[in-house]
Every structure is written in structure tokens, then in C-alpha cells.
Amino acid sequence: SKPLVYDKLGFLPRRDGIGSFWFSNEERAMVHDELFPKRALIGEGCWWFNAQDGDNSKYKHFQGDKRFAMNDFKEAFTVSVTDALDSHCNTLDLRMPLQCKFWIEELPDQVQRFITLGGYRLYPDYIKVEQDHKTLTLFHSWKNYGVGVLPNNHPNWNYKYQVSFVLMNEKKEIVFLYTEPEAEPSEWLKGISYNYLSRFNIPAELQGKYTLCVGLTDKTKNNEAAIDLAVSGNLKIGKWIFVVELEL
């Protein structure tokens, strides 16, 4: 079924039972060896609050888990986050409302841990600009701080997100855009630097002061900056990232 489900129809793998033996060795190997990083993994935590009488304090099914040693609910839920990160999950469903309430009230640090480290967190790690009259040469390096991937290669998205540089005038209006064809965000994995060299000429009619910015644009929406990059807010102009002021 894999060639049909994943390759032809473009479905993404989803797995519940993250943080338990229900996520089997065979399935883990399939994710590691066959699916990731080409396919983003949609993860769901275990449904631990499943006591038939509603009293979850006495029903601790996780204590019988065959993979992880867990003594209480806090340990069980923390294991879910660790397992989700180790499995490169793009998402982690906290499951039913009562369980979500426990997460938020008792383990906000673990919720934040997945927000910070799970999925994709893309950012330009280094940008060097060289200007020769109307020609700009940019050396730029990108990283993914998250354990997952931006599924830009999914058939429904069809590589619509692209690395683009723009020039803004003093009114913050975009007057020039260049898209780097060699940079592909779906390839960016945690722990690796992705380096590119971009060179382009600026139209002769542009003269004066301009702001050079970079962003991940959506080619289906008039190349507007579409992805929130993991960069300090004081460098942001909307979803664009400030690079340098230029005099043309």
C-alpha cells in the first residue's frame, strides 16, 4: 500500500500511541528508513486518560507499557514529548480535552518543549552581502532548528514556498524581488547548514535608499512572505527578515 498511499496519493503518515509500545519497532523503522525526511510525520500522544468510570487517578495503564518505564502521568506525558522529538514528529496531538487540560496545567514546560523543538523552525543563520554598483552577491546559510520538516515537496503544495530576497523602499513597499532557485526548504534538516550563493542585478531605475529583506515566499500568493521564520522580532518586517540597508 505504501506506493499508492504515500507516493501516488501523497498522504502523510500519522501515528497515535507516541510514547508507548503501541508505536512498534516495525513502524519506527519504517518512519526512520523509508518515510522521513521525505514525508512529515503527524504524531499523536497516547490516550492515557481512558478510565471507563472517569476516575483516571486509579487507571494507570502506562505502568504496563512494554517499551518505556513510567510511574505517573507526568512521566508518561513527558515520555510522549521525548518520543515525538526522537521520531521527528511535525505535530503532537495532546488528545482528548481532559488530557489537554492536564498538559496545560501540569506540564506547560513540556508543551513548550515540543513547540520549540518539534516540527520545523527555519531561519537564515548567516547572510553576507557584497555590492558592486547594481549587482548584489549574497552568501546565505539556512538551518532548521526543529526535528521535523517543512513538507514543501507534498503534491498539494508542489514546492510553493521559496527563498526570496526583496528590496523595500522607504514606505516599506516591495519594488524588487529575486527568488533563489537552488534553495529548497523541504530538504532542510536539523543539525545541517544549507549554503547558497545568489547573484542578481538590480534594475537601473531603482535609485536611492532601500532595505534588503529575505523571506520564504508563497508563489501561489503573489510571492508574499508566508512562513514565520525563527528570528528575533526586532529583525522582522511582517514575515520578512531585515538584512541590510542599501544605497543605490
Model regions and ranges:
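Acidic, low-complexity intrinsically disordered regions
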Residues: 18, 43-44, 99, 138, ...
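Short amphipathic alpha-helical surface micro-motifs
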Residues: 73-75, 103-108, 179-181, 195
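Extracellular/luminal regions of secreted and cell-surface proteins that mediate adhesion/ECM remodeling
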Residues: 112-248
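Catalytic-core regions of glycoside hydrolase
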Residues: 1-98
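Intrinsic disorder/low-complexity segments enriched in polar/charged and small flexible residues
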Residues: 24, 49-50, 105, 190, ...
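Catalytic cores of secreted or luminal carbohydrate-active enzymes
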Residues: 76-127
